[in-house]
Amino acid sequence: MPAARETLLEAAHAAVRARPWSAVRMVEVAAAAGVSRQTLYNEFGGKEGLGAALVSRLVEDFLDGTGRAVTEACRGGADPAACCAAAAHWVLRTARAEPIVHAALTGCWGPRTPLPSRPPPPAVWARAAREAHPAEPGRLAHVLCDRAVAGLDRATRLPVGGPGPRPRGGPAELVETARGDLQRAYEAGLRIALSYVVAPQPGPDEEPCGRVDAVVRALLAR
């Protein structure tokens, strides 16, 4: 029942934004979604399964949003460094607004948030080196970078650093920059942004995003 599943996740999200996850009751989530409690259990198996599914959904939405932020900035005429700064702005804003995303990025889970599912065994991770898991902040940081670079690909309709003519309307730097250099520069920039998630400072996001821009710009100019 995909529709019921979506409605239940939305109801669970609304519930955890209103009170700690430890105080959220399954019967209340089912009632808010307009389904029976049995339907909820059929979909998720229990509160732990519902919470893990909600965490996965919000983290995936966050990662998708990172790519969209880069795509929109690029299509607006921003160069690669400014596009990374746009991704950093999305990261800071979302981590501040969504406690579950903040917990996934920092690894600091508590009673106010549901817990992610357990990560797969190391042998499975070895076959999926660039897949994200909410319980693994290090892997999440890698995938965050991948999604940002993929946002440039979508904006230009051409793999960054790939062959072929320069895309119309896209910055020339996107084609000329080798993917490996861009990947490393973006990872450095986004890890700076993540440091502000772990240890935030007062004031607007323009200052940390400006530092991201400066670092990425310097790395790409080497």
What are the residue ranges of the model-derived segments?
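Short, basic, alpha-helical segments at the C-terminal edge of helix-turn-helix-like DNA-binding modules
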Residues: S56-D64
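Amphipathic alpha-helical packing segments from all-alpha helical-bundle domains
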Residues: L63, A103, R112-E176, G180-E187
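Short hydrophobic/aromatic patch on the recognition helix
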Residues: A33-F44
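Amphipathic C-terminal alpha-helical segment
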Residues: R93-A97, A150-G162, E187-E206, A218-R222
